[in-house]
């Protein structure tokens, strides 16, 4: 037991940052910003401020999207940063949305619903672990795709009913059966082999550059001017993209 503790200590020492330059710190600072906004979302959930929860998660997802890109741009990727990012993602996109939905449903004492909530958190952890283990194993044709729904997208899907209720005042969605099945669907989709668009190395054809810029501009404007409406639109666009991702992925796989 003592030897195991020594080995873990040595491993932690090896993973410590070798330098503290601005180049190294910036991506990790962005990751910590994502974690801060995720924790702020949790704080807002405790008081039932569901719109604020969604806005905090949106901001956290922006920082989460930037940290990896900045690290690659500055050539400052590290194992330390990868682990920090995974831990942050687990909290922000795994634990926080699960807690928010549980509180939104008025803390039901139903054991089955609690099991469903726990299932989502567990699948989030499994999804992140699988992603880290597959970083160097993906074939070239699959670089534009994720295996399963990523945790940030899963968090958006989890909070989708909260946004619908707040925007449309549709309380019929607040049903154990509907929300339970929705959470199970999201959980399974995270650990499935469903191909989903990555966007990390996605190249837009020249003929589609202007239409894509227009769509991005409209989405950005919608999110800024009306975050909840923009959030709903973004989630609907993502849901619509899922079958297209599978079609394009299978075509590339056949050609490979």
Which residue ranges define each predicted feature?
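C-terminal membrane-associated helical module and adjoining short loops/tails
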Residues: 1-15, 143-256
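Multi-pass membrane catalytic core of lipid/isoprenoid biosynthesis enzymes
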Residues: 26-32, 73-131, 160-163
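Active-site His/Glu-centered metal-binding helix of metallohydrolases
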Residues: 36, 62, 66, 70, ...
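Helix-coil boundary and interhelical linker segments in multi-pass alpha-helical membrane proteins
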Residues: 40-56, 91, 95-117, 160-178, ...
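Alpha-helical transmembrane segments of polytopic integral membrane proteins
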Residues: 39-42, 59, 97, 122-125, ...
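Short, amphipathic, aromatic/basic-enriched membrane-interface segments that mark the entry/exit
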Residues: 20-28, 80-88, 145-147, 197-208
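Topogenic membrane-insertion module of multi-pass membrane proteins
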Residues: 1-65, 233, 245
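C-terminal ends of transmembrane helices
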Residues: 69-78, 125-141, 191-199, 245-250
């Amino acid at each position: 037991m003592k030897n195991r503790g020594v080995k873990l200590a040595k491993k932690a020492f090896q993973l410590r940052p070798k330098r503290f330059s601005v180049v190294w710190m910036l991506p990790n600072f962005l990751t910590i910003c994502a974690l801060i906004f995720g924790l702020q979302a949790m704080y807002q959930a405790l008081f039932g401020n569901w719109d604020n929860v969604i806005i905090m998660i949106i901001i956290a997802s922006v920082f989460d999207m930037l940290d990896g890109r900045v690290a690659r741009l500055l050539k400052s990727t590290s194992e330390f940063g990868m682990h920090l990012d995974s831990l942050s993602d687990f909290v922000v996109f795994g634990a926080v949305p699960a807690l928010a939905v549980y509180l939104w449903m008025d803390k039901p004492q139903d054991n089955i619903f609690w099991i469903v909530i726990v299932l989502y958190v567990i699948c989030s952890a499994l999804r992140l672990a699988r992603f880290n283990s597959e970083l160097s194993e993906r074939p070239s044709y699959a670089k534009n795709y994720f295996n399963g729904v990523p945790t940030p997208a899963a968090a958006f899907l989890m909070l989708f009913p909260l946004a619908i209720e707040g925007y449309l005042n549709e309380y019929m969605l607040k049903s154990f059966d509907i929300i339970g099945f929705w959470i199970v669907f999201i959980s399974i989709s995270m650990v499935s082999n469903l191909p989903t668009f990555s966007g990390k190395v996605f190249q837009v054809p020249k003929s589609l550059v202007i239409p894509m810029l227009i769509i991005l501009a409209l989405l950005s404007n919608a999110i800024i001017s009306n975050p909840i409406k923009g959030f709903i639109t973004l989630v609907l666009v993502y849901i619509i993209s899922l079958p297209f991702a599978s079609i394009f992925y299978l075509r590339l796989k056949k050609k490979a």
